[in-house]
A protein has these predicted regions:
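Beta-strand-rich binding/interaction modules
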Residues: 257-258, 270, 324, 580-646
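Glycine/proline-rich low-complexity spacer/linker segments in large multi-domain proteins
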Residues: 126-137, 190-244, 265, 329, ...
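Early extracytoplasmic/domain-onset interaction patches
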Residues: 39-117
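Solvent-exposed beta-hairpin/edge-strand motifs
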Residues: 111-154, 249-254, 606-617
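Hydrophobic alpha-helical and helix-loop surface patches within well-folded domains
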Residues: 28-35, 48, 52, 56-59, ...
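Hydrophobic helix-coil surface modules that form long, contiguous segments used
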Residues: 219-221, 225, 235-425, 454
Length: 662
């Protein structure tokens, strides 16, 4: 069933009524509480304000952003076209590369310098990092840097030249780059692939996952300008979009898979392999494209020239390119239905691949293609159609853990069935956030990890019918919250006091927050706003304010109180039924807000005749600091039980005080 199917709680029936009784002042009656539909708040109460940066306000004034969440009429972002060539020597573990990057200045600013990311420099001896980088192999060895046709040298003096500081290279241009102009940059470099244990990739025997392997233009955006934060290992990335043409040279017999579409299959794949791929493109099941027998016979690739093959790939509108290669890989393939991805009114499909070593069958990798197919099809229905030509899961070094790249995911280690599906669907969920919706992962990890963790829960519930991954997220968040060890979500990914606080703030709490927001708005409105956010910011760079404004624009509600509570503070939610007592022909139900987090109170009153009444007290009753509210409900038919938040939508820190009788 489509998880977006709208459901609504019943409105307040005439049989029951709610009256607010002041918690102080000698029992004097307060104005009646409006029995609101789920998620509504009084427009008369503004609520808690959300801090807005001066930079965002400036962007609004300049017309690049809006207060409705729609990109502004003057929105712009930079672009780059990459032509890259690389050869990997599997014996020496060395990669030799060269390339030309054409950078397009779509900003209104004249640029006198540009910044380039050399992410592999995290492996240089003495490099700065805040996570375990056990291998100091070497950084990027640059042999050529040219800009606008001029060879550049390392220099800290003014004038044309470049300098490297950790993972950031600054290039001072020979000529200013005006708005609407472009500049070509030429690079040649060498680097060594780190062994297993390096974060997010590396090599493990005859298996390589190659990431962050080329000079990449840093982001220059309309809010913060150049993004020059160092890559320290914990906080992830903020990458611009572009087109890539990539040529990769490997020994014949080594399979290669990469971001992008393979342009020369007849030159690198055997006829048998190509025929099986063609079958997989329309098969209902999984096709074993390359088997162990094919490996033994050496029939997976062509013979090549001088024992080498060059694989050519083209990737459009992506923020990065990664690739994997091995002399041991098996290859499974199928296809996935993604809906109308190109807007021509007809359904589309995408290729699904799994590359893995034979020994990984014990980790259920022979099911990987099936898991990937379900994930792509589910997210294409739940969010937006998947637009890329393939989705490929790669068995990589153990230190990959689970890591996302455009059209690819690297998964390392041993897994059971549940674990392999979970990591697969999570990393595939990242194809939407941040691959298609390109947020700043460094500053706002929750915008990609938290949203993807939430999406993972929806996918797992669909695949493992009845599995409640949302409860796992909620429990992981509450376990830390109960200790007082959590920190706010609006924090740079490199500035958390511990990995546990980073993990909760980036994954579990924001995923739990989205479940709560769905409870506030109702599933129909929530899903409409969620997909609208993705649609508006497809291939763009949203900030948190753009997400906030989109939800408020679609729902028609001021949600500043919600964002402030769950993103900027570490307030805890503790809603309790304090007392239930007779009041003539009515019952007075005293609700207490024992925590600092203001949220609506969703109350289920179950009567002995089987009727269940859903009542809602809006969140704004708590905005002024009030801690207690008395709800007066009809006494007959007799009340069997009363429960706060019966659907478990809100992360309350103490469930034991939410039901009557206890």
């Amino acid at each position: 069933m489509d998880s977006r199917a709208p459901t609504r709680r019943s409105a307040l029936a005439g049989l029951f009524f709610i009256t607010a009784v002041s918690a102080c002042g000698g029992g004097r009656s307060a104005p009646p509480v409006t029995a609101a539909a789920p998620g509504t708040t009084s427009s008369a109460v503004r609520g808690l304000e959300v801090p807005v940066s001066v930079a965002f306000e400036r962007a609004v004034a300049q017309g690049t952003r809006t207060r409705t969440g729609v990109p502004g009429p003057r929105y712009w972002q930079q672009w780059a076209d990459y032509r890259l060539e690389a050869e990997l020597n599997p014996i020496s573990k060395r990669l030799t590369g060269k390339g030309t990057v054409t950078y397009y200045n779509r900003s209104p600013d004249t640029l006198h310098e540009v910044y380039v990311e050399l992410l592999h420099n995290i492996f240089a001896p003495g490099a700065r990092h805040n996570t375990d980088v056990p291998w100091s192999v070497e950084g990027v060895e640059l042999s050529r840097v040219a800009a606008q046709g001029q060879q550049l040298k390392v220099t800290e003096k003014e004038g044309p030249g470049y300098e490297v500081d950790g993972t950031i290279m600054r290039i001072r241009l020979p000529k200013p780059l005006p708005p609407g102009g472009s500049a070509a940059f030429d690079f040649a470099w060498k680097l060594r692939i780190p062994p297993d244990g390096a974060p997010r990739g590396g090599q493990d025997g005859e298996t390589f996952f190659i990431n962050y392997w080329y000079p990449q233009m840093a982001v220059y955006d309309d809010i913060n300008g150049w993004q020059t934060d160092q890559y320290l290992g914990n906080a992830e990335f903020y990458m611009g979009y572009g087109n890539y043409d990539v040529a990769l040279t490997l020994p014949a017999g080594w399979l290669v898979t990469s971001t992008g579409r393979l342009l020369n299959p007849s030159e690198v794949l055997s006829g048998q392999t190509r025929a099986r791929l063609d079958t997989a493109s329309h098969a209902k099941g999984i096709v074993r494209v390359v088997t162990e027998a094919d490996r033994s016979a050496g029939t997976s690739t062509t013979a090549g020239t001088n024992g080498k093959l060059t694989w050519r790939f083209r990737a459009d509108s992506v923020r990065d390119v990664s690739w994997a290669t091995s002399s041991k890989y098996l290859w499974d393939a199928t296809n996935a239905a993604v809906g109308d991805a190109n807007g021509d009114g007809r359904p589309d499909t995408t290729a699904i691949n799994a590359f893995y070593r034979p020994e990984r069958r014990t980790s259920h990798w022979d099911e990987s293609a099936r898991y990937s197919r379900h994930s792509i099809e589910f997210f294409s229905r739940y969010l937006l159609p998947y637009p890329y030509p393939h989705m490929t899961a790669v068995d990589g070094p153990t230190s990959c853990g689970g890591m996302e790249y455009p059209m690819m995911t690297c998964i390392g280690g041993q897994w059971d069935t549940l674990g392999l599906y979970e990591v697969t669907t999570h990393e595939i969920g990242h194809m939407w956030f941040p691959m298609l919706v390109g947020s700043d992962e460094k500053r706002y990890a929750w915008m990609d990890e938290g949203l993807t963790q939430f999406d993972q829960s929806q996918s797992m519930a669909d695949f493992f019918k009845g599995f409640d991954d949302e409860e796992r997220n909620r429990r992981n968040y509450l376990n830390l919250a109960e200790t007082g060890g959590e920190v706010e979500l609006m924090r740079h990914g490199d500035r958390y006091p511990s990995y546990s606080s980073y993990g909760v703030a980036s994954y579990y709490k924001p995923a739990t927050m989205l479940v709560a927001l769905r409870g506030v708005l109702g599933p129909e409105t929530f899903n409409k706003a969620y997909t609208e956010y993705a649609r508006r910011w497809l291939y763009k760079h949203p900030s948190p304010s753009d997400l906030f404004h989109t939800f408020e624009d679609v729902s028609g509600q001021d949600l500043s109180w919600f964002w402030r509570t769950w993103l900027y503070e570490t307030w805890k939610l503790d809603q309790a039924i304090d007392t239930v007592s007779p009041a003539g022909d009515s019952l007075d139900v005293v609700i207490e807000n024992r925590g600092k987090a203001p949220m609506p109170v969703h109350l289920a009153v179950t009567r002995t005749d089987g009727q269940v009444q859903q009542l809602t007290v809006p969140a704004n009753v708590w905005f002024g600091g009030e801690r207690r509210r008395t709800l007066r409900i009809a006494r007959e038919p007799a009340v069997k039980s009363i429960e706060i938040d019966p659907k478990r939508e809100f992360p309350d820190i103490d469930r034991s005080n939410q039901a009557w009788p206890r």
